[in-house]
From Swiss-Prot:
The gene is micu-1. Gene3D superfamilies: EF-hand. This is Calcium uptake protein 1 homolog, mitochondrial. Ca(2+) binds at D283, D285, N287, E294. GO terms for cellular component: mitochondrial intermembrane space; uniplex complex.
């Protein structure tokens, strides 16, 4: 009994001691944490000691950045939050820095001029080509072989295409003074002006042709109000046109000022019959000739009827170089330096025909010449010359030219001379009479083939056409390849070609729409019997 009591007392003492030890050990951290919180709250305002949910606000370290625990990567850490985040293969993550290399390489490729690099490589590899060894062998043997290589056309880049599109819109919709300021390249400074700010702007014949020819880009050095200073006394030998050309007779070395530019554009867009009628109207004396004053009235009348003259804004032109002058080179050529001469209608129409001839010659010389032949252009180039101002969709135009190229290739290609081109364009000057004749033949049930077209040309205009040129024209406008000519489209295209696109309205059509709506409203107002309130 005593032994049992002794054992129980020892057990009770052991349990009590362990409880006291456990209690002291477990309560020590709690007391330390509570003392720490009390010390931290001494310097905190009572309003900021607790959060919105009633919890004690913990003091943050000044350099605390994130609560994220350190791990193997962002994808591993976020998988517990975003369950559907794609898995990235660890070796692929190590290649992340290669992205910078790919971006830099792409930028270098986009900024590289591959045409220049290609030319450099081609120039460096020329001595190592087989052609070079053949040339060396031919020179060693003493034989002189002249090989004319056809220069390849340089493909237009993105920048050039955008510039050409802008310049084509400029030709269509801008005022004549802006077109002149953009395409003119020369200026002659007034010798009496020491500052050099007073000058007159001139066009060369090439500038004049470029100002209304679509698809031809202005040289990069020149643009709007950008001109090269030209001194006629220092450059007396420099001629910008052939002495036999009509441009050479207009002024200094064949240069064109703004007044002459306006009237030359009017000449290109007006037929011979209109000028002959205007001469008869203003010939008060009835002697068949006009003096300077009467010619000025004819000039103003014709210009007011053309789109070029209607768009001219003489009253708002800032520079005197772009105003119509009463004493221009044209008037000096027609009436002499004193202005007392007279101009007959025959002389004026002859001047107009020579102008058409010189411009056609410059357009012909711009075409692609045939290989190993002088003075001939390819049939495709002749077709391009006919479609120059056709206003046909680009896709259809390419299809028409492709048809001509397939028809005249290899031995079938004979080339077209300037005399043949000139004869066909003289035939086109009577396009209205040709249209009537072809229409009558069609009403009679006759198909328009090459034989009929040549006969109409001789009977109506008195101009014989070569068989080869007629074959090219029929191939160009023969859509169904039956050897017959669809003359309606040909006549419409040739009319626009002879006017060189100068008869088109010089606006986008929006203002004409507003004018039409206003005119219809006025007519409805005056014609309505009901009062408008």
């Amino acid at each position: 009994m005593l032994r049992h009591n002794f054992r129980s007392s020892i057990f009770i003492r052991i349990v009590a001691n362990s409880w006291s030890i456990t209690r002291s050990v477990s309560s020590a951290p709690i007391k330390a944490e509570s003392r720490k919180q009390q010390d931290s709250l001494k310097n905190i305002d009572s309003g900021e000691a607790y959060t919105a949910l009633g919890n004690i606000r913990q003091k943050k370290d000044v350099f605390h950045y994130t609560d994220r625990a350190s791990g193997t990567g962002y994808s591993h850490y976020s998988n517990s939050v975003y369950q559907h985040r794609p898995y990235i293969w660890p070796p692929l993550r190590k290649m992340y820095n290669w992205n910078y290399a790919f971006v830099i390489a792409g930028m270098v490729i986009l900024m590289s001029d591959f045409e220049w690099i290609k030319e450099q490589i081609k120039g460096a590899s020329t001595p190592f080509r087989p052609e070079a060894s053949q040339k060396e062998e031919s020179t060693d043997s003493g034989t002189e072989i002249e090989v004319k290589e056809k220069p390849k056309k340089k493909k237009l880049g993105f920048r050039e295409r955008r510039i050409i599109e802008y310049e084509d819109r400029l030709r269509l919709y801008s005022t004549p003074d802006k077109i002149f300021r953009y395409f003119a390249t020369l200026k002659i400074i007034d010798p009496n002006d020491e500052s050099g700010r007073i000058f007159e702007v001139f066009m060369t014949p090439e500038d004049f042709l470029r100002s209304f020819t679509p698809g031809v880009m202005q040289p990069r050095r020149w643009g709007l109000d950008s001109f090269k200073a030209y001194n006629p006394e220092k450059h007396k030998r420099h001629k910008f046109s052939d002495p036999n050309s009509i441009f050479y007779k207009l002024g200094e070395n064949g240069l064109i000022n703004f007044s002459d530019y306006l009237f030359l554009m009017t000449l290109l867009s007006t037929s011979h019959a209109d000028f002959a009628l205007a001469f008869k109207i203003f010939d008060v004396d009835g002697n068949g000739a006009l003096d300077k004053e009467e010619f000025t009235k004819v000039q103003q009348l014709i210009m007011s009827q053309t789109t070029v003259g209607q768009r001219h804004r003489d009253h708002v032109t800032p520079n005197s170089s772009f105003r119509v002058e009463t004493n221009s080179a044209l008037e000096t050529y027609f009436f002499g330096k004193d202005g007392k001469g007279s101009l007959s209608s025959e002389k004026f129409i002859e001047f107009q025909e020579r102008l058409q001839h010189d411009i056609l010659k410059m357009e012909f010389e711009r075409r692609d010449a045939m290989e190993n032949s002088d003075g001939l252009i390819t049939e495709e180039s002749f077709a391009q010359l006919l479609l120059l101002h056709a206003q046909i969709a680009e896709k259809k135009q390419k299809h028409m030219l492709k048809r001509v190229k397939r028809r005249f290739k290899g031995d079938q290609s004979k080339g077209v001379s300037f005399d043949e081109t000139k004869a066909f364009f003289e035939f086109l000057y009577h396009i209205d009479d040709v249209d009537i004749a072809l229409h009558f033949h069609k009403m009679a049930g006759m198909s328009i083939d090459a034989k009929l077209l040549k006969r109409v040309a001789v009977k109506v205009t008195g101009i014989p056409l070569s068989d080869h040129v007629v074959d090219v024209v029929i191939t160009l406008f023969d859509d169904n390849l039956d050897g017959k000519l669809s003359h309606e489209e040909m006549v419409a295209v040739m009319r626009r070609r002879m006017r060189r696109g100068l008869e088109r309205p010089r606006d986008t059509g929006l203002f004409r729409l507003f004018d039409a709506v206003l005119e219809c409203g006025k007519r409805a107002y005056h014609a309505s019997p009901l009062p408008f309130y």
